[in-house]
Amino acid sequence: MRHLFLLLASLLALPSTALATWSVVAVDRSTGRVVIASATCVNGDDQFLPGVQAVVVPGKGVAACQASVDGTHTNQMLVFNELQKGTDPKAIIELLSADPAFQSRQFGIVDLQGRRAGHSGLTNGYVAQDIQGQVPGTEVFYSIQGNILRPGEVVPNAVKAFLNAKGAITDRVMAAMEAADAGGGDSRCSCPPPAADAPAATIPCDGKTAHVAYILMAEKSDTNGDSHNNGKYTMFLRVAQPDKGANAIHEGENLNPVKTLRLRYDAWRKTQPASFR
């Protein structure tokens, strides 16, 4: 334990990445699926956001590590390793609290035992909020969180959409992402007029509240990698702005990445069998 405290204390002197965002993490005990989705106004490539934020342990649980993100990935690996051990998410938050920068972090953690926990640090940018719960009458559990959101009901609206959606757990997560987007999402970006010769000039932009977005689902039979999010997963859809990676937005899509994520999700959903629920 002393080694853990010393390791986390060292984070105080190491760089963090400021990552305003909203995210949805969820599990379905009846199918063993774990899902994470997120969007942010940080304009990185298509791997930047999931690369620093997502913690995925097939058959065990899922988490989002955001706000002032640990650039060393020590926090993310702590969550990854503890989920593999079966540690209660509330106990994982307690372990994370040893980090001197804990109050600048935001976490949402859910495991396949239905246990969940969240933390929004006191120095997270306004509006910052996290809500956990269970869909009544189901084995679906969730945590929805965000920071530097537009004033209003971004996270509560996402929760309502998640609860009211029908279909598979991924359908619920996608509905929650759209509700957060419609509620204003990340407060720092919008749709500025592009230059006439810019790659985005011929692509519509409707109510843009993020620059990048993704959704990832792991079946319980999927496998881990050697880090917290580089395993082999059944579904992983990413969206980035034009010229920002292999999954960049292109003509026929929308510069609002959540709208484009919906298009790509619907295309993927059509490939799934009728038994997918």
Question: Predicted regions: what is each one?
Answer:
Residues 5-17:
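Bacterial N-terminal signal peptides
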Residues 1-2:
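N-terminal secretory signal peptides that target proteins for export/translocation
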Residues 19-277:
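N-terminal nucleophile
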